[in-house]
Amino acid sequence: MARGGGAAGVSMAHHLGIALVVLVFAAMAQVARGGGGGHDYGMALSKSILYFEAQRSGVLPGSQRIAWRANSGLADGKANGVDLVGGYYDAGDNVKFGLPMAFTVTMMAWSVIEYGEEMAAAGELGHAVEAIKWGTDYFAKAHPEPNVLYAEVGDGDSDHNCWQRPEDMTTSRQAYRLDPQNPGSDLAGETAAAMAAASLVFRSSNPGYADQLLQHSKQLFDFADKYRGRYDNSITVARNYYGSFSGYGDELLWASAWLYQASDDRRYLDYLANNADALGGTGWSINQFGWDVKYPGVQILAAKFLLQGKAGEHAGVLQGYRRKADFFACSCLGKDAADNVGRTPGGMLYHQRWNNIQFVTSASFLLAVYSDHLAGGAVRCSGGGGAVAGAAELLAFAKSQVDYILGSNPRGTSYMVGYGAVYPRQAHHRGSSIASIRASPSFVSCREGYASWYGRRGGNPNLLDGAVVGGPDEHDDFADERNNYEQTEAATYNNAPLMGILARLAAGHGARARGRLGQSLQHGIAANHTSLPHGANHQHASPVEIEQKATASWEKDGRTYHRYAVTVSNRSPAGGKTVEELHIGIGKLYGPVWGLEKAARYGYVLPSWTPSLPAGESAAFVYVHAAPPADVWVTGYKLV
């Protein structure tokens, strides 16, 4: 369990005010190497998403790309009379912990909400959406009744006693449940946040599924709010692994914020505002964001609502949230008067030895999001007689942290497995460190794994591609040893926020013009458009262009039907790259489609006789329905 993220080590000093003064932007302490193309953010993005396939539990799909994994946990929930097959293992072990899993899915969804266009341009949006759905499908199973949530499968104590592949595990698979007699407002609230955020991702491509997720979210929020309590008081076996040190106030606010964004229902904005003081949203100044402490995320979401003009009569309260968001940014930048995040000599944000990188990736994502929504504005800091930090400075600092992770550090080590020339070879991970069951099908027992595999010298036999490990200590030192779990264990919540900022950086480092996707999401429509309307301003437009027009209309049974012709073109210059694996999403469609084939999991693909689009070429399809034009967009592709 690469946890180490409890609030026990978090500075929670109440921040009473932020002075309004100006300080000229000082040069960064460390200039990252990636500004001129030193890092391949697109490759890192692809790997960061690929890692989640190594963490899958359940029946693996035909699209599985991590070939050394196989089916596992196929009886999960059976003893409890419920199907709990699926979901994700949290880190290097075989337990399904609900709190970090839900936070992981929330952050994956937020990454797509903010940077889905950029992921599509990199050809990774389809993989990102698939990773989200793997989690939400499991949560739907784990929430069989409005006031019941299965919070964990397996337990850390028995799991840590064994070193086994997930395909072989003989450890306890007991399922632990929350209900009115055994409440868990923190875990139910985080799961509500995950389902609400994910509903935005699927709103246009799969509206029925989005509705289901939103319904789960609303029920879970009501359950969390009505039956209050810490989940680790109800499920004590979780306490030593993912204890809820910060309590549940942050998750209740977090869930209400996501429900407001997903539904536009003012009740959730009212909750966010009316409970701002009582639940700590405008009281706590915190510079750490992760699976336990959600306050900075809530504060930046609330600031985003304010900046978008969605605060309504609660603008004053949301200003209080924004001041705390400013504190978080200033503390990361080292510009607060009293409470700045520490840094290593090499410039990495530093909180703790155990899995410190989780806080680096989450902070970098929050800073990038805040930067993009400031729209040329600035945050106001209280340090050094007063200072401001512009949006560009926030993004530049976030980029420096990502560059550090990818290898721009004193050791020249990439902390993403499989990226760069030097990266961890002995990740603390059961499945990666034991020969694949496909290559060596002989059963590996509980203790045999420790005797034969755990202590082996040399690299793991299976590449944990894309995994971001815990990272170096406060001196930038790192020991690539399997038993050094504080530094070499990766976790899903390390990667989830990194997906978003890698997509942002892959598209460019300058100011981001928010096109159709951003506008749609502000209205609760998660349409992953990469083909923007004519005249839309977007710095990093996709080479794939979509045009549609009505070609015929007729009356039948009192209704007017329209035939629409859609052309999909590769606008790359002559001799340029070919578009392959093109996936198309269609929303608000109420009739048949000709000229496309249904994709395996969602959306559409080009027909088998047109598998690719060379530069300058086009493909066409038509649809008929009695409605205005459908929403048509690109959800993913590869340029080769």
Swiss-Prot record:
Induction: By auxin in roots (at protein level). The active site is at 93 (nucleophile), 428, 480, 489. This is Endoglucanase 2. Optimum pH is 5.3-5.6 with 1,3-1,4-beta-glucan as substrate (at 35 degrees Celsius). Gene3D superfamilies: 1.50.10.10. InterPro entries: 6-hairpin_glycosidase_sf, 6hp_glycosidase-like_sf, CBM_49, Glyco_hydro_9, Glyco_hydro_9_Asp/Glu_AS, Glyco_hydro_9_His_AS. One of its GO terms (biological process) is cell wall organization. It comes from Oryza sativa subsp. japonica (Rice). The keyword Phosphoprotein does not apply. The keyword Signal applies.
